Amino acid sequence: MPPLLLLPAIYMLLFFRVSPTISLQEVHVNRETMGKIAVASKLMWCSAAVDILFLLDGSHSIGKGSFERSKRFAIAACDALDISPGRVRVGALQFGSTPHLEFPLDSFSTRQEVKESIKGIVFKGGRTETGLALKRLSRGFPGGRNGSVPQILIIVTDGKSQGPVALPAKQLRERGIVVFAVGVRFPRWDELLTLASEPKDRHVLLAEQVEDATNGLLSTLSSSALCTTADPDCRVEPHPCERRTLETVRELAGNALCWRGSRQADTVLALPCPFYSWKRVFQTHPANCYRTICPGPCDSQPCQNGGTCIPEGVDRYHCLCPLAFGGEVNCAPKLSLECRIDVLFLLDSSAGTTLGGFRRAKAFVKRFVQAVLREDSRARVGIASYGRNLMVAVPVGEYQHVPDLIRSLDSIPFSGGPTLTGSALLQVAEHGFGSASRTGQDRPRRVVVLLTESRSQDEVSGPAAHARARELLLLGVGSEILQAELVKITGSPKHVMVHTDPQDLFSQIPELQRRLCSQPRPGCQAQSLDLVFLLDASASVGRENFAQMQSFIRKCTLRFDVNPDVTQVGLVVYGSRVQTAFGLDTHPTRAAVLRAMSQAPYLGGVGSAGTALLHIEDKVMTVQRGARPGVPKAVVMLTGGSGAEDAAVPAQKLRGNGISVLVMSVGAVLREAVRRLAGPRDSLIHVAAYTDLPYHQDMLIEWLCREARLPVNLCKPSPCMNEGTCVLKNGSYRCECRGGWEGPHCENRILRGDAPMARSFHQEPAGLQGPTPSQQAPKHLRIGKALSSAK
């Protein structure tokens, strides 16, 4: 045949070519839920009497690689089966051109033997004769119990059978056999749906996603009471999912001339012939996928103050904390009990509180102890629980270390029974604090903290009065519906802390810490704050008055919990020049701050308040010098009034950048320049004389606490260095760096080199300098960067 005459045959071959397909199943859930699905599959257990047969497709269309994935799915499913002769029996049959029994159901009596046998199955190849394999099973499961127990058939195939499957599959289902169709490689979903039992959504899975497929299989079996979960709070939920197929289809692209022979001798006809192009098109099939979800360690939202909870397995987690709260277990502010006190936590363990409420109470005490107790603390703690009877789990002070106390707390069991709060209070009054019988100044203050979520079933007024008569301070923590009863027990509304939502319970920790000591220091101990004092050290103030200012700010500092996680304090003085006495991150403790304040220099000369405020904006209130993103910031300026003529604009610039400014002006006359500098009326405190400063201390603390509670803008002041731009996004921020800089805060100069890890070790090219100290990331940001890169 002439070559030209072969063209039609070639075109016909292309036209009728079978196109390849790519299939995929995707469950539409977030990453956290996907992690819970994976964890839940490890918490499920099938221990009922049941016969399970794996029917593995070993044909050439599967291929050896996909066959190994089929075996991996079968092995993973066996991990949840209680395999024994009297409970779960497992067998395996491979099919290709013909079915081949790998091992019957009565061959092995342990899970490990079954898993080893599945692992040793050899791929055989051949045609995909699914129908023949199903017909063989019509005579019964090899080694099975003849239908006296439920029968489960798990078909793992690509759904490309070369024979009919609908009738033999229907016959098996009519005999009561539950059929799962598990796709592998690029399955045909329509054939899998034909094979599977009803409801189809619960019996069609994809073996390529082993943990998801195992969860789906066990979830369906649990609805038939064949499987259970270790946690009673686990539940089966439907999730939208999508089965997608990427099909290659042909489209008419146009016509071209081709030559054909004719009936007339020596004649060739030129005719238009169509030609085609190939195009890939997604075909989607929406469905519901039923999966078991178990409560995760992050469901209780243990990370406070905007921290992000990262689960680590079934019951462990860690918190990614904002910079202001780094280093703490649950991003909790560092608090302390500085008074000498004995505290007994009394936990309601009755049926009215429920197991969930009892666990919340234990979590509350655990967080409180972790937040406030130190090894050198003068406070001692004990823990007791009650329902029908009182049980003292940890007598007051009888523990070696805080971790020992926490371990004892974790081991306290839930007792149930009636809520006999009155009886518990009587026993606590008599025996709750051991043999401590000292009185007066020799005995620490004794406090009982009652945590309950249910009303007492016995009388409480008399026992509570008896406890208070024995010099016990009673504090009550509970829900709003119990407020009246808690007031009756404690004797005062001031001794009651209520919450509207169970999760709000944990927000009471700072308030409880404040109330425990007999003389709680006023202020906002739990509020984070970056605070800078600006002192006028010019000649117009004088050395003696400057000393009065120093004494005043030292007394104010005593009202704050100074540490890198709560309140940071800096000090700037100005006169003949502007000088930073110490920055925000210079001194991590209150004692060090007080000592440095006493050593601040008196400068003399003529001062410029405007220059000093600009110095604070450029050299003090920056992330390079210790300011923390997302933490309220305030400047308290103490001045005699002179030198304030140029300060109004710099003060307004600070306020526009998210930094609050309060002016304390000392002198008989309030100058107009100071009024303009103060801005809003509530940002000015006028003091008649330097000796009167202590009388305005409470007013200053109240203003600072009010500013500390205001919402903050994470980009004001900007945490981005080297002229980077701060962009708010989803409750956080990111830095867009200018050319030549990179890093979370644009702190790293981009150098030439093959790998980022090698840049810091390369010799810098001539004329190219590394970042100056002001351009480098401050310590607290470098730590954050190291953590993020480690992740």
UniProtKB/Swiss-Prot annotation:
VWFA domain segment(s): 51-221, 342-516, 530-704
Residue runs in coiled coils: none
Example GO biological process: regulation of insulin receptor signaling pathway
Keyword DNA repair carried by entry: no
Free-text tissue specificity from the UniProt record: Detected in uterus, kidney, and skin. Also detected in intestine and lung of adult mice, and in calvaria, femur, brain, heart, intestine, skeletal muscle, and lung of newborn mice.
GO cellular component: basement membrane; extracellular region; extracellular space
Record's subcellular location: Secreted
SS bond list: 298-309, 303-319, 321-331, 715-726, 720-735, 737-746
Extent of the signal sequence: 1-23
Lineage top rank: taxon: Eukaryota
Residue ranges of every copy of the EGF-like domain listed in the record: 295-332, 711-747
Glycosylation site residues: 146
InterPro entries with a match to the protein in the record: ECM_Assembly_Org, EGF-like_Ca-bd_dom, EGF-like_CS, EGF-like_dom, VWF_A, vWFA_dom_sf
Region of interest called Disordered, as start-end residue ranges on this chain: 762-791
SUBUNIT field: Forms monomers and multimers.
This protein's name: von Willebrand factor A domain-containing protein 2
Provenance organism: Mus musculus (Mouse)
